[in-house]
Amino acid sequence: ATGVARRRRAACRPLPSQGKVLTVDIPNAKSNFTARKAMIYLPPAALSDRPPALPVMELLAGQPGSPSRLIDAGNIAATMNAYAAKHDGLAPIVLVPDQNGEATHNSLCADTTQGNAETYLTTDVVNWAKKMLPVAKSARMWAMGGFSQGGTCTTQLVPRHPEIYGAMLPVDGELKPTNGSVGKMVQEYFAGDRKAYDGNRVPVNAIASSGTSEQALFTGAGERDKESISNMRTIADAARKAGMEVTELIVPGAGHDWHAVQAVWRPGLDWFGERTGLGEMTKSLKEYPQVEVLQ
């Protein structure tokens, strides 16, 4: 175990045997964004009498989707509990906020005329977690991840906020925020301002403009989802140019689906745990049976 992990383990006994999934209301004090209830996973260490400051994974569902869909289809509780069982109760705290407001709406994860989703996700959610939960404060200890539209949000927002997030774990994401044609989005979300859309809302532009070499990209796509594979390669190239550590995975037999998400996030959790000092990876990425490593 790393020194950080040893200190955390010593600080947080006694421990329950498993973590908990809770449904919470996260205030929208800065954004005024109308969000559905969020869900969170608290590992055993977070439930102890003296919880340590733990890493955070802020995870976003696709659209249509919901926080409960991500928790269930992503197999979050079982995956996190299995990790915690191998690390003396230590695992990241998982935040699953609602980025869209309703299942049929796409917020573009941006501050637009249809709501301030970016401010909600990167300010309201983050401030609430830092106030209410035993979370670490430094950017290296925070990751964002997501599936499909949630993956797109990840590659938009993480490079725009290097002071908050140090890692991104998108699966089957898009090249850009998408809800109809670009022209339609520019009119309906940005009051006709094309530069507001193209600027830092498009992931490769956000990465080039404000991504840093302190950040890292751990990404994947289903083998049958050719468009997402192409998107992944393009965004990974941009991340490398920004000096980021980049890992690309393919999930054999999977498409644009939750099988891909689960397969990518299993090694992704081990990778993030090592990155944040919870424990070292015990095998190489090539030894995970459900994924193939591109980079």
Show which residues each predicted segment covers.
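Non-catalytic cap/lid and distal C-terminal segments of serine-dependent acyl enzymes
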Residues: A1-Q295
